[in-house]
C-alpha cells in the first residue's frame, strides 16, 4: 500500500517503474520470496487450491496452529551444546564466506519487488531528485540483490547508496558486478553486531536503512544492539524498512532435531543461522530502540506443488518503523 508521504515523492518516472515491475514474472528462492501486494490471489474455495502455484493472505485454522507448534516443540527439544553453539556464532562470517564462495551471485534473485512493497525506495521525481539528496544504507547487502536494482532504476544525481555485510566474499562479488557504480555506491565489510559501527557516514544521516532477511541471521541477544544502532544512524524522520522470517514458517518446521541453538533459533546445514520472529517481538525491539511503527504485516502465503500435491505454508513479517522528528 502506498502512503501519502511516499506517493508524493514519486514522479512520472517512479510510477512507470512501479507499473513495469508489477508485471514481472517472479523467481522464488530460499530467502528472497516475493511478498504479497496489489493483485494478491486469495483462496476462497479449498477445492481450487491446486489451480495456482501460490495463494496470499492465508488464514490458519486451529489444527494447523497446533501442528506447527508440535513440530517446533519436537525439533527444539534437544538444544545444541554450548561449545558447538559458540563455534557457529564465532565463525558466522566464515560460513557466509563459504556460502557465497559456492553460490557466487547465483543463489538469490535481485529484489525488484522492493519497489512495490517499499515505494519509498522507488526513484524520486526528476525535479525532486535534483534538489533532494538521498542516502540509503543496507545492512547485510550480500551480493547486491537490493543495491543493484536501486542503482539500475534510479538516475537521481544526489543518490548515495551504502551497503555492508559480514562476508568479505559477498562484498568482493558485489563490487565485481557490471551494474555496480562506485561513484554512487560504497560497500564494505562490517560486523553489525558490534557496539560501535565503523561506517563512512555520520550519525543521524541516513534517509532509509534496509534490512531484508538479515536480523534473523544474528544471535538473539545481539539483535537489540543492531536496532539501536539503526536508530543512531537514521536521520530524524528516517525510515527502517524490514522483512524477515515469521514464527512457524515452513523453514522452521522442517528443521531436524539437533539443529536448534535456542528457542526459535537454528543452524542450517551450511552453518548459517536463522531466527523466526513474532510480530510482538519485533514491535518490542523496534519500540525499545526508539522507532515508531508505521507498518507491521504478517505475510502468510500458501505455495503448492501441483505435481506432487504438496501444500507449503510460508510466514514472513514486513515492517516500516520511523525515527521521530
Curated annotation (Swiss-Prot):
Residues annotated to bind S-adenosyl-L-homocysteine: 100, 112, 138, 140, 165, 191, 212
Physiological role: Probable methyltransferase.
Species annotation: Drosophila melanogaster (Fruit fly)
GO terms (BP aspect): tRNA methylation
EC number in record: 2.1.1.-
Keywords: Methyltransferase, Transferase
Family according to the record: Belongs to the methyltransferase superfamily. METL family.
GO molecular function: tRNA (cytidine) methyltransferase activity; tRNA (cytidine-3-)-methyltransferase activity
Subunit and interaction comment: Interacts with Psn.
InterPro entries membership: Methyltransf_12, METTL2/6/8-like, SAM-dependent_MTases_sf
UniProt-annotated binding residues for S-adenosyl-L-methionine: 96, 100, 140, 165, 191, 212
Name under which the protein is recorded: tRNA N(3)-methylcytidine methyltransferase Mettl2
Gene of this entry: Mettl2
Listed GO CC annotations: cytoplasm; mitochondrial matrix
Tissue specificity statement from the Swiss-Prot or TrEMBL entry: Widely expressed. Expressed in ovaries, head, thorax and abdomen of adult flies, and in the CNS of third instar larvae. Isoform 2 is predominantly expressed in larvae and in adult tissues that have been tested.
Amino acid at each position: 500500500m502506498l502512503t501519502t508521504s511516499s506517493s508524493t515523492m514519486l514522479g512520472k518516472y517512479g510510477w512507470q517503474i512501479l507499473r513495469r515491475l508489477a508485471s514481472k514474472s517472479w523467481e522464488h528462492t530460499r530467502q528472497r520470496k516475493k511478498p504479497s501486494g496489489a493483485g494478491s490471489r486469495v483462496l476462497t474455495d479449498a477445492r481450487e487450491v491446486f489451480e495456482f502455484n501460490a495463494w496470499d493472505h492465508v488464514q490458519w485454522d486451529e489444527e494447523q496452529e497446533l501442528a506447527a507448534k508440535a513440530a517446533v516443540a519436537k525439533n527444539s527439544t534437544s538444544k545444541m551444546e554450548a561449545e558447538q553453539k559458540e563455534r557457529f556464532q564465532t565463525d558466522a562470517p566464515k560460513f557466509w564466506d563459504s556460502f557465497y564462495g559456492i553460490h557466487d551471485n547465483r543463489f538469490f534473485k535481485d529484489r525488484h519487488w522492493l519497489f512495490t512493497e517499499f515505494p519509498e525506495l522507488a526513484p524520486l521525481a526528476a525535479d525532486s531528485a535534483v534538489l533532494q539528496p538521498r542516502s540509503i544504507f543496507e545492512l547485510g547487502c550480500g551480493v547486491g540483490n537490493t543495491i543493484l536494482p536501486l542503482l539500475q532504476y534510479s538516475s537521481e544525481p544526489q543518490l548515495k547508496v551504502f551497503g555492508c555485510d559480514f562476508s568479505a566474499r559477498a562484498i568482493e562479488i558485489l563490487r565485481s558486478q557490471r551494474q555496480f557504480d562506485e561513484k554512487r555506491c560504497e560497500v564494505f565489510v562490517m560486523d553489525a553486531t558490534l557496539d560501535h559501527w565503523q561506517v563512512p557516514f555520520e550519525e543521524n544521516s541516513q534517509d532509509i536503512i534496509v534490512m531484508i532477511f538479515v536480523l534473523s541471521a544474528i544471535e538473539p541477544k545481539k539483535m537489540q544492539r543492531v536496532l539501536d544502532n539503526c536508530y543512531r544512524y537514521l536521520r530524524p524522520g528516517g525510515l527502517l524498512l524490514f522483512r524477515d522470517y515469521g514464527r512457524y514458517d515452513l523453514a522452521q518446521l522442517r528443521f531436524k532435531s539437533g539443529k536448534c541453538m535456542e528457542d526459535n533459533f537454528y543452524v542450517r546445514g551450511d552453518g548459517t543461522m536463522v531466527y523466526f520472529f513474532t510480530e510482538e517481538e519485533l514491535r518490542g525491539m523496534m519500540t525499545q530502540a526508539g522507532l515508531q511503527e508505521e507498518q507491521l504485516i504478517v505475510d502468510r502465503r500458501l505455495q503448492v506443488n501441483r505435481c506432487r500435491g504438496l501444500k507449503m505454508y510460508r510466514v514472513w513479517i514486513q515492517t516500516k518503523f520511523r525515527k521521530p522528528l
